[in-house]
Amino acid sequence: MTTLTPLRSVTVNNTYPYTIAIGPGLLHDPLRLAATIRGRHALILSDSEVAPRYAAQLQETLLRARPDLHLNVFTLPAGETSKSLENFSAAIAQLATLGATRDACLFALGGGVIGDLAGFTAACWMRGIDYVQVPTTLLAMVDSSVGGKTAVDIPQGKNMVGAFHPPRAVIADTDTLATLPLRELRAGLSEVIKYGAIRDPVFFHWLQTTREALLARDPAALAQAIARSCEHKADIVGRDPLEKGERVLLNLGHTFGHAIETAQGYSTPGSNNLNHGEAVAVGMVLAARLSNALSLAPAQDTETLKNLLDAYGLPTVLPSGLTPEMLLERMRLDKKNIAGRLRLVLWRGIGHAEAVSDVDEATVRQILANSTNQHTTYSPHQHATTKPPNRRPH
């Protein structure tokens, strides 16, 4: 059901500016959606969880405004394992079959996996076509849909093959969050917390006091969290679109997090492996503890961050089965490293972060060892089976 929450808009100002529209009912807005299409060909890329709920609605809305449109839908299995070179090739084949020309448009309907794969496909087809991010998860709305990072995974690491290719628009229909599993909602809130942790103490405090409303999917609280997160990312991406400087700060927790995801094997629906948001939550605590060890941040702030993540039901210690060397092996392949030395985003306390080069591996190994020795009661399966509110998708 569409709420009365007002539409919010955030603009990313760089070489190719675009607008992030945030609000309910946007999948029913033919003028907004059709305005993103310059040609006569479009492809909707989605997954097996999202397509049955929303692909037909997006099709109907687009064709209502553009009955001349040649429009196909391509659906992939849900889960991180779909973000592969094989599925990239399959998506390219779909564009070829469609007869897509350089003025075609690709719609990424789903979460971060679909957005990343669709963006990379759009970046490569005929050296670049338009694509529109239509995120249906909180994590995609606040993070992966904004900024133009596109990629696929390979066995050696996450997001190792990709390109910078900004979307033509981001259209975030918040009504889709009504059907989002609680585990995925929490994963998105991990990235929301990150924005407060790296640059906004006021927002961090707001998240401490608004937990119940956010977990209950209060429309006004969610809209505020999404808009504020997007404002932070748009501000940084507008100045540093290619991650040559401050944009790297958005990776707090990600070096550890990506290593966890790769070492465990990427998460699929129903699996025990941590998903991206969960891995980043653990990664933020590890980065904060490393910062404590290097005398960069007060231990009290680290406990405050850990307690906030705990309060949102997110994991904060390494899952069982991972060793420090397993993780370090993957961290050495991280894209942020320079001259073969670890480069991590570390914490300076609530609202502050910085990139630190030449981080001592022995200290990192000790932080990882300390975390593996801690007991965790976090249960991904419990969150995976928690049902969202009993609301019918519009």
Curated annotation (Swiss-Prot):
Reactions performed catalytically: 7-phospho-2-dehydro-3-deoxy-D-arabino-heptonate = 3-dehydroquinate + phosphate
Compositionally skewed regions (Polar residues) per UniProt: 371-388
GO MF annotation, one: nucleotide binding
Binding-site residues, Zn(2+): E191, H254, H276
Annotated stretches, region: Disordered: 371-394
Compartments it resides in: Cytoplasm
Superkingdom to which the source organism belongs: Bacteria
Cofactor dependency: NAD(+); Co(2+); Zn(2+)
PANTHER family xref list: 3-DEHYDROQUINATE SYNTHASE (PTHR43622), 3-DEHYDROQUINATE SYNTHASE, CHLOROPLASTIC (PTHR43622:SF7)
Role, per record: Catalyzes the conversion of 3-deoxy-D-arabino-heptulosonate 7-phosphate (DAHP) to dehydroquinate (DHQ).
Protein name: 3-dehydroquinate synthase
Taxonomic source organism: Xylella fastidiosa (strain 9a5c)
